[in-house]
Amino acid sequence: MQLRKLLLPGLLSVTLLSGCSLFNSEEDVVKMSPLPTVENQFTPTTAWSTSVGSGIGNFYSNLHPALADNVVYAADRAGLVKALNADDGKEIWSVSLAEKDGWFSKEPALLSGGVTVSGGHVYIGSEKAQVYALNTSDGTVAWQTKVAGEALSRPVVSDGLVLIHTSNGQLQALNEADGAVKWTVNLDMPSLSLRGESAPTTAFGAAVVGGDNGRVSAVLMEQGQMIWQQRISQATGSTEIDRLSDVDTTPVVVNGVVFALAYNGNLTALDLRSGQIMWKRELGSVNDFIVDGNRIYLVDQNDRVMALTIDGGVTLWTQSDLLHRLLTSPVLYNGNLVVGDSEGYLHWINVEDGRFVAQQKVDSSGFQTEPVAADGKLLIQAKDGTVYSITR
């Protein structure tokens, strides 16, 4: 069982009472699979690398780079935000969102959700329940808004709204122009949950989001009204971990079908209009997944990389040689599936059969957030803050 969020400091969103058992026995402690031997069919190379502050260290974070108009935007947990030239990684501008604490020291901003770029703004959320909109031109703060709780997932911009899913189960819509809160929807919270929240996805005027209560919700964006809720995961089992029912992955909407994935299961297809379940498959994950054509690509809670059909979730192939290597979410790049791991490797996988086609050691601090593929570039940020541009 994948416990990446539980193994890092402070990752349960409630304090466990003494005497609670997280594990059944010592047998539940898993070992990382050894690095598989791969004969590279091509040689991935690092085009450039640039340091962006001190990164995230051993804290859970959803910070990853964003690319727009040939500029890469990246941040670290302390509050440093940089704009970099996408061709060579050279700095365009740099700002700090850390707050002054006395004459010489600064209080870290604890950035945690982002980066999102849209409409001339860079959006980032923080553990201090702040959402920032920076001007893409120079990094100045266009607006800053206090939200209902920690902003652990990336902001999502749609229809003039900035959608924020906070750690206490609130979905909030902010005005894109000035950050004013337009509406708030309570998604309910269980007594125990993983640290991290589902980023919403938008389609046909609705925001679709997963919740820590095991439900997927559709909300009318114009007024903030609940359209439907559907449970896809039940809190069952003999241990606290077995009973975690979080839906922390971002739903995907394709042709009127919502695909959603919960930590302890299930992978579920729902009708966008009604929320009715069309099919479900017993799979679980905290990693975002991909729907491409007639296939679903995902990394499950044990770090199996899988391809499934969108019609019924039938398994097409499974790659099991990366078990418990704490993989990132997958990304499609140049016809291959790419995942990073906690030891700083990138693994390139053939989408047709799941075989490895290349492997690259990139960074010694390791990866936690997924690579980003955009405009023909592959970007990834390591835990120490270094941003890499990879080519093949």
Curated annotation (Swiss-Prot):
User: What PANTHER family is this protein classified in?
Assistant: CELL SURFACE PROTEIN, OUTER MEMBRANE PROTEIN ASSEMBLY FACTOR BAMB
Q: Which GO terms describe its cellular component?
A: Bam protein complex; cell outer membrane; membrane
Q: Which PROSITE patterns match?
A: PROKAR_LIPOPROTEIN
Family of this protein: Belongs to the BamB family.
Using the record, list the residue span of the signal peptide; answer none if the entry has no such feature: 1-19
Q: Which NCBIfam families match?
A: assembly_YfgL, PRK11138.1
Q: How does it assemble?
A: Part of the Bam complex, which is composed of the outer membrane protein BamA, and four lipoproteins BamB, BamC, BamD and BamE. Monomer. Interacts directly with BamA. The Bam complex has the shape of a hat, with the BamA beta-barrel crown in the outer membrane and the periplasmic brim formed by the BamA POTRA domains and the 4 lipoproteins.
Q: Which SMART domains match?
A: PQQ
Protein name, please?
A: Outer membrane protein assembly factor BamB
Which organism does this sequence originate in? Escherichia coli (strain K12)
Keywords linked to the UniProt accession: Cell outer membrane, Lipoprotein, Membrane, Palmitate, Signal
The question of whether Lipoprotein is a record keyword is answered with: yes
HAMAP family, alphabetically? Answer: OM_assembly_BamB
Where it sits in the cell: the answer is: Cell outer membrane
Kindly give the membrane topology term recorded for this protein. Lipid-anchor
